[in-house]
């Protein structure tokens, strides 16, 4: 069996670095042919390029000459001779890398800038292992229209869990999807208690080690709202049949309830290497991709309802998805700007979602969903959010 040829977008981020771990653990199954990253860590992507022997490397920003020198130095240190991958530099670098011939493109980019690479990957016919939920959320029908049935394989742990659970029944037998949420670092706090939380507290996630934006979104439950939209689009299940339940241990990653009342759950210790491996190998499983639950150790799994008063983001995301058009794009863009303002000390934590709600209330949508209308809506949302933040007081 020939190893699957893999392209990794966002290789220096959390998803990308763990994907390389997965490839290292199963070299007979996977072979990295290309990498891309933002360019903030040239030394790391140079090391990754040499380590994986990638044929092409892309960075959104940075100096091509400097990267080439770093690759040469890393190759010399590793004793690798005659290694000179093709290098792409510029805002479209990840899109060009995504179009390289391969079997699987893993999109681990953070944010809606992943939309163009997602569409490029789908255009090649390769399987898209999608960790960049924002591209599906803001692209919506555009992404679905570009994808062949089964071409998109989710990498988010919740959606990977649902995909596995759905193997237990037919589409007609599905009653509802149940996404689990850890509750984040502020679980159990009232809205009033959230007013004065700090950026440092928001980044102290109890389970996952992620980047600044995703970790903050997890604290506000915006991330779970985005995941509800993603589940709706991926699995064609109506929004009113998608529930969220808080599960602090993050062992049960999601569940599917069937029409006969049975519920199938996927459980494993929190480790993103498992859904990454499944995304790269789908529909096959990768042996020993991650540790299994240790049933010899005493443990308890608890579940509790989501406090939608303290954390209104999930309901707000559902409302945006129901309106469709460019509303999800506005939801995402406004949130990104508000999160940056929070970390800059300009607004309170609770003002993040309040600002998003306010901007959404002013949006009228687009008559036609195109890449251009999505980009225009995002531009409008970012500008409107910044206007509102300029008049916001702590």
From Swiss-Prot:
Q: Which UniProt keywords apply?
A: Isoprene biosynthesis, Manganese, Metal-binding, NADP, Oxidoreductase
Please name the top-level EC class of this enzyme: oxidoreductase
Is Methyltransferase a UniProt keyword of this protein?
no
Q: Which SUPFAM superfamilies match?
A: 1-deoxy-D-xylulose-5-phosphate reductoisomerase, C-terminal domain, Glyceraldehyde-3-phosphate dehydrogenase-like, C-terminal domain, NAD(P)-binding Rossmann-fold domains
Q: Which reaction does it catalyse?
A: 2-C-methyl-D-erythritol 4-phosphate + NADP(+) = 1-deoxy-D-xylulose 5-phosphate + NADPH + H(+)
Q: Which Pfam families match?
A: DXP_redisom_C, DXP_reductoisom, DXPR_C
InterPro entries per UniProt: DXP_reductoisomerase, DXP_reductoisomerase_C, DXP_reductoisomerase_N, DXPR_C, DXPR_C_sf, NAD(P)-bd_dom_sf
Give the transmembrane region(s). none
Q: Where does Mn(2+) bind?
A: 156, 158, 227
Cofactor requirement: Mg(2+); Mn(2+)
**Annotated GO biological process:** isopentenyl diphosphate biosynthetic process, methylerythritol 4-phosphate pathway involved in terpenoid biosynthetic process
Family matches, as Gene3D superfamilies? 1.10.1740.10, NAD(P)-binding Rossmann-like Domain (3.40.50.720)
Q: Can you provide one Gene Ontology molecular function annotated for this UniProt record?
A: NADPH binding
Name the Enzyme Commission number(s) assigned to this protein: 1.1.1.267
Residues binding 1-deoxy-D-xylulose 5-phosphate, per UniProt: 133, 157-158, 182, 205, 218, 223-224, 227
Q: Which residues bind NADPH?
A: 12-15, 38, 41, 132, 134, 211
Its function?
Catalyzes the NADPH-dependent rearrangement and reduction of 1-deoxy-D-xylulose-5-phosphate (DXP) to 2-C-methyl-D-erythritol 4-phosphate (MEP).
Say which family it is in.
Belongs to the DXR family.
Name listed for the protein in its UniProt record: 1-deoxy-D-xylulose 5-phosphate reductoisomerase
The species this protein belongs to is Paenarthrobacter aurescens (strain TC1)
Gene assigned in the entry: dxr
């Amino acid at each position: 069996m020939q190893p699957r040829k893999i392209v990794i977008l966002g290789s220096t981020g959390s998803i990308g670095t763990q994907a390389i771990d997965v490839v290292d653990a199963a070299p007979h199954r996977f072979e990295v042919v290309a990498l891309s990253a933002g360019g903030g860590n040239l030394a790391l992507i140079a090391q990754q390029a040499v380590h994986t022997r990638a044929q092409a490397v892309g960075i959104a920003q940075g100096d091509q000459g400097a990267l080439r020198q770093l690759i040469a130095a890393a190759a010399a240190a590793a004793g690798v001779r005659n290694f000179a991958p093709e290098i792409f530099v510029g805002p479209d670098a990840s899109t060009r890398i995504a179009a390289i011939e391969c079997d699987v493109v893993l999109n681990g980019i953070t944010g809606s800038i992943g939309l163009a690479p997602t569409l490029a990957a789908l255009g090649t016919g390769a399987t898209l292992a999608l960790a960049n939920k924002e591209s599906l959320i803001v692209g919506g029908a555009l992404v679905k229209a570009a994808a062949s049935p089964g071409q998109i394989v989710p990498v988010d742990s919740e959606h990977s869990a649902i995909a596995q659970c759905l193997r237990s029944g037919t589409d007609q037998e599905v009653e509802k999807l149940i996404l689990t949420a850890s509750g984040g670092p502020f679980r159990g706090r009232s809205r009033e208690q959230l007013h004065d939380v700090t950026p440092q507290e928001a980044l102290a996630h109890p389970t996952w080690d992620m980047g600044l934006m995703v970790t903050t979104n997890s604290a506000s439950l915006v991330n779970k709202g985005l995941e509800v939209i993603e589940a709706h689009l991926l699995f064609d299940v109506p929004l009113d049949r998608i529930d969220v339940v808080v599960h602090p241990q993050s062992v049960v990653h999601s569940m599917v309830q069937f029409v006969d009342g049975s519920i199938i759950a996927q459980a494993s210790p929190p480790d993103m290497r498992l859904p990454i491996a499944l995304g790269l190998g789908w529909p096959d499983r990768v042996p020993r991709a991650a540790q299994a639950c240790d049933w010899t150790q005493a443990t308890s799994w608890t579940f509790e309802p989501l406090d939608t008063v303290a954390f209104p983001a999930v309901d707000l995301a559902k409302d945006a998805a129901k309106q469709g058009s460019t509303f999800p794009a506005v939801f995402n863009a406004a949130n990104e700007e508000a999160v940056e303002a929070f970390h800059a000390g300009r607004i309170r934590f609770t003002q993040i979602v309040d600002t998003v709600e306010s901007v959404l209330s002013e949006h009228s949508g687009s008559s036609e969903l195109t890449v251009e209308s999505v980009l225009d809506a995002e531009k409008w949302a970012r500008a409107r959010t910044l206007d509102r933040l300029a008049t916001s007081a702590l």
